[in-house]
Amino acid sequence: MFFHIVLERNMQLHPRYFGRNLRDNLVSKLMKDVEGTCSGRHGFVVAVTGIENIGKGLIRDGTGFVTFPVKYQCVVFRPFKGEILEAVVTMVNKMGFFAEAGPVQIFVSNHLIPDDMEFQSGDMPNYTTSDGSVKIQKDSEVRLKIIGTRVDATEIFCIGTIKDDFLGVINDPATV
């Protein structure tokens, strides 16, 4: 889920940022460039927590830009198979539903929803139990288990299930 790791990045800085605030400018550019991004290997970078080392700059020929090797600590979010997450439902259709847990989108197929829940179409599509006591619709909060992940270069997709003990709707916006 969340990990605190050390990463490295080569930062290019324009000559106008040189001077007394060089380090501050480098750190703010690093935060702007990496926070909120996703690398397939490490996951989503949530926050930069510290700078371990800023190496000596190397002037690039012809441009005046300087490349600094920066070693920094950060918190990353990476979901794994078998992990239990709480997510918010964003879309419901007859094939299943999509939910989001932070930056990760999770699809739960109708085959991975308990058998006693049926799809109800209409202006607010949902999955409802036969007695109507539990309803999964847009903005419902669900607890689910990740059963598969696919990692791209810039995004992570997950497949989840609520067909297990203690999984399912946590908070239904219709009852609030």
Swiss-Prot record:
One of its GO terms (cellular component) is RNA polymerase II, core complex. The keyword Coiled coil does not apply. It comes from the Eukaryota. Keywords: DNA-directed RNA polymerase, Nucleus, Transcription. GO terms for molecular function: single-stranded DNA binding; single-stranded RNA binding; translation initiation factor binding. It is found in: Nucleus. Gene3D superfamilies: Nucleic acid-binding proteins, RNA polymerase Rpb7-like, N-terminal domain. Its main location: nucleus. CDD domains: RNAP_II_Rpb7_N (cd04329), S1_RNAPII_Rpb7 (cd04462). InterPro entries: NA-bd_OB-fold, RNA_pol_Rpb7-like_N_sf, Rpb7-like, Rpb7-like_N, S1_domain. Pfam families: S1 (PF00575), SHS2_Rpb7-N (PF03876). GO terms for biological process: nuclear-transcribed mRNA catabolic process; positive regulation of nuclear-transcribed mRNA poly(A) tail shortening; positive regulation of translational initiation; transcription initiation at RNA polymerase II promoter. DNA-dependent RNA polymerase catalyzes the transcription of DNA into RNA using the four ribonucleoside triphosphates as substrates. Component of RNA polymerase II which synthesizes mRNA precursors and many functional non-coding RNAs. Pol II is the central component of the basal RNA polymerase II transcription machinery. It is composed of mobile elements that move relative to each other. RPB7 is part of a subcomplex with RPB4 that binds to a pocket formed by RPB1, RPB2 and RPB6 at the base of the clamp element. Belongs to the eukaryotic RPB7/RPC8 RNA polymerase subunit family. Component of the RNA polymerase II (Pol II) complex consisting of 12 subunits. RPB4 and RPB7 form a subcomplex that protrudes from the 10-subunit Pol II core complex. This is DNA-directed RNA polymerase II subunit RPB7.
